Regions:
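Long amphipathic alpha-helical coiled-coil segments
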Residues: 190-205, 231-241
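Non-transmembrane, extramembrane segments of multi-pass ion/lipid transporters
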Residues: 158, 199-202, 262
Length: 308
């Protein structure tokens, strides 16, 4: 479907497009194939739109009269979406590569109504579309920050369980995806701002600059949380090392206490006939008492010296 801005938003067919007015379209792969020759799109770009990309940094392709790029869109609750963008002079075409829940299409439609039709420009539509894509991201980032703070408190209190490491890795993966997502958007907006193929009005590029600054702030927030995750990983590693050291310390203390008894047992296990304790009627009790006294003495010494 295509929409043309002429004091109001009119839905039109592809053969009714007037290049003197701003035109915005949202099409699927088959619809793109049927109109690609009319707009002069390269076959390689059309083929790219046939399947979703698994990469964020797919790059921006500049042609004489249009710009092409793919955009992988993060969706925290469902599967990620993927669209492709064709930007011509006075025209934005969004290609639905993978948008199963229709969320990206809804954001696209809301972007069309952001400004009054008579005041809408190509730069404003691009700004509104990207702004709708990242509109709720600040809340997501804040939620991740609060979750990391809770994990930090648990670690400080020593109440972490075996799932701690898994949770940290999940947060790290999510933050990395968000970082790459914002880098991808910045690649696109910076390319638009450079305006190498002269598709935009210079006095309207401030809208592109505004969305660039907003996405940069989101990226900085994500990078800050990534540093927090790294610190948590280091702290958790230190926590595990300290826990292991305490365990080894206990084993060492226990070994130190009972090692003399091992010597006593080995000593009397030699069974020499000349050993007087063998013929003494209190020999057995004597060995038991000696072992208890030695173990008790070492236990008291260890406690005073804070071995445990």
């Amino acid at each position: 479907m295509f929409f043309q801005f002429n004091n109001k938003i009119n839905e039109i067919s592809v053969d009714k497009i007037d290049d003197s007015f701003l035109t915005v379209g949202y099409v699927n792969g088959d619809e793109l194939l049927s109109c690609s020759q009319k707009f002069g799109f390269a076959e390689s770009t059309v083929e790219t739109c046939r399947k979703p990309t698994k990469y964020f940094r797919s790059g921006v392709e500049l042609y004489d009269n249009y710009t092409f790029t793919e955009l992988r869109i993060i969706d925290i609750e469902t599967a990620d979406d993927c669209v492709a963008l064709y930007i011509r002079k006075n025209m934005l075409l969004v290609v639905d590569v993978s948008d199963k829940d229709g969320s990206t299409k809804r954001k696209f439609m809301s972007a069309l109504r952001r400004y009054a039709p008579e005041n809408t420009t190509l730069e404003k539509v691009i700004y509104a579309f990207f702004d709708s894509l990242v509109a709720g991201d600040i809340k997501i980032i804040e939620d991740i920050g609060m979750q990391l703070s809770s994990l930090e408190e648990e670690l400080h209190e020593g109440s972490v369980d075996e799932t701690f490491s898994t949770v940290i890795l999940e947060k790290k993966k999510l933050l990395l995806s968000l970082h790459n997502y914002y880098e991808q958007i910045l690649d696109i907006t910076e390319s638009i701002d450079e305006n190498e193929n002269d598709l935009f009005q210079s006095d309207h590029l401030m809208y592109i600059n505004n969305i660039t600054k907003r996405v940069e702030r989101l990226r900085e927030d994500v990078d800050s949380l990534k540093n927090t995750v790294e610190h948590l990983q280091d702290a958790y590693s230190s926590y595990l090392d300290a826990k292991l050291n305490n365990t080894m310390k206990r084993f060492t203390v226990i070994t130190s206490i009972f090692f003399p008894m091992t010597i006593i047992v080995g000593w009397y296990g030699m069974n020499f006939e000349s050993m007087p304790e063998f013929s003494w009627k209190y020999g057995y009790i004597y060995v038991i008492a000696l072992s208890v006294i030695v173990a008790g003495t070492l236990a008291i010494i260890g406690k005073k010296r804070k071995w445990y």
